[in-house]
Amino acid sequence: MLTQIINGRILTPQGWLKDGSVLICDGKILEVTNSDLAVIGATVIDARGMTIVPGFVSMHAHGGGGHDYTEATEEAFRTATNAHLKHGATGIFPTLSSTSFERIYQAVDVCEHLMKEKDSPILGLHIEGPYLNPKMAGTQYDGFLKTPDENEYIPLLERTSCIRRWDISPELPGAHDFAKYTRSKGIMTAVTHTEAEYDEIKAAFAVGFSHAAHFYNAMPGFHKRREYKYEGTVESVYLTDGMTVEVIADGIHLPATILKLVYKLKGVENTCLVTDALAYAAYEGNEPID
């Protein structure tokens, strides 16, 4: 099926395009042109001045539509994923919060099943925790927090290939062995919920930590201990060339001035915008969510 979208502000790598059109065939973009002349055989959609952008890839989202991916049920996965699809995502990496390994295995089974479906928007599983610094736990449930245990993560990663990213605190005992192993499996490993300073971040990057999750949040910046001043995790990540970052760019988790600083120092190629969405995202019900 051929579809032509006209009369919208089109975002391209070169900037905004007006009075152009986007030609789509079977869900794939064929062409972006500066002409809005009708294409023979195409169904025309009038965007009525709205913004036209490529589909988003949601790389850090814990849930949506009233469900959390950590529920590890097919209903939760489908409902949360559909909530994000309705708001512009075309691909998603469902994110688990700190939980038991029994629940992680259940989520893996669900994820693998759904990824086998034709044109599945689920691209792989993302795990945050449970190997987190309890001092920096934030909203992560501390009842599951622990240090990395190879007797847990190696059997899991030998069993499945659906896990594409795993975030932990790099200063924990065993974190470096964890990162070396996940890197050998092609899994992106990120620092998160951490108070690591420069030497720890530098060492973590060397063994495979390549990304900083929800940059600035759940990690300290420049600080003072007695009369001495120290760089925090934030400055350490800035100083680590090659380490990418993600920011929750909702204007609440970080102010616009900090977002500008991230853009200036890390650049567009090393910065991702994420929602870190919870079950409440795109929830249309009236009842509280458990």
Residue ranges of each PLM-predicted region?
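A conserved glycine-rich beta-strand in the N-terminal activation segment of trypsin-fold
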Residues: 15-24
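Active-site-adjacent C-terminal substructures of enzyme catalytic domains
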Residues: 200-290
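Active-site glycine- and acidic-residue-rich loops that bind
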Residues: 100-106, 171-173, 186-198, 248-265, ...
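Divalent metal-binding pocket/active-site signature
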Residues: 127, 135-149, 155-231
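Divalent metal-dependent hydrolysis catalytic cores, especially in the metallo-beta-lactamase
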Residues: 62, 66, 78-107, 120-133, ...
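Generic structural signal for well-ordered alpha-helices
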Residues: 81, 105-112, 153, 179, ...
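Charged helix-capping and loop-helix junction motifs
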Residues: 73-76, 107-110, 149-151, 227-233
